[in-house]
Swiss-Prot record:
One of its GO terms (molecular function) is structural constituent of ribosome. The lineage of its organism: Bacteria, Bacillati, Bacillota, Clostridia, Halanaerobiales. Part of the ribosomal stalk of the 50S ribosomal subunit. Interacts with L10 and the large rRNA to form the base of the stalk. L10 forms an elongated spine to which L12 dimers bind in a sequential fashion forming a multimeric L10(L12)X complex. One or more lysine residues are methylated. Pfam families: Ribosomal_L11, Ribosomal_L11_N. The gene is rplK. One of its GO terms (cellular component) is cytosolic large ribosomal subunit. CDD domains: Ribosomal_L11. One of its GO terms (biological process) is translation. NCBIfam families: L11_bact. This is Large ribosomal subunit protein uL11. Keywords: Methylation, Ribonucleoprotein, Ribosomal protein, RNA-binding, rRNA-binding.
């Protein structure tokens, strides 16, 4: 028989840097999950992606066990890295803060494809281009 799910927790944690401090500790603690066990497993799974923010979806079961699925980093983080930016534009339609090429967009779309609700690579590229425009990044 399948285990009974008592909660799903969604967090965004820097790769390889999960620790019991907020936001991880309180989110897991209220569901009775062993926080250190999660931190060790997450850090081991994401150590090769250092420097990126990794979204994670944790499923907590009635017996206080858990499993988690890591997603691809947010498109905005990947675009900032590709354009070499610290932060996006506060006024994207007025102030353009950087540029990315179509090749950069294609690489990001290929990386994000499993998490995007897109039927084709072209559709995924259009989604990423839209994100870039809303951040004040010019696509060339």
């Amino acid at each position: 028989m399948a285990k009974k799910v008592i909660g799903k927790i969604k967090l965004q944690i820097p790769a390889g840097k999960a620790n019991p401090a907020p936001p991880v500790g309180p989110a897991l603690g209220q569901h009775g999950v062993n926080i250190m066990e999660f931190c060790k497993a997450f850090n081991a799974k994401t150590q090769d992606q250092a420097g990126m923010i990794i979204p994670v979806e944790i499923t907590v079961y009635a017996d206080r066990s858990f499993d988690f699925i890591t997603k691809t980093p947010p498109a905005s983080d990947l675009l900032k890295k590709a354009a070499g930016l610290e932060r996006a534009s506060g006024q994207p339609n007025i102030n353009k803060v950087g540029t990315v090429t179509k090749e950069d967009i294609k690489e990001i779309a290929e990386l994000k494809m499993p998490d995007l609700n897109a039927g084709s690579l072209e559709a995924a590229m259009r989604m990423i281009e839209g994100t870039a425009r809303s951040m004040g990044i010019v696509v060339k």
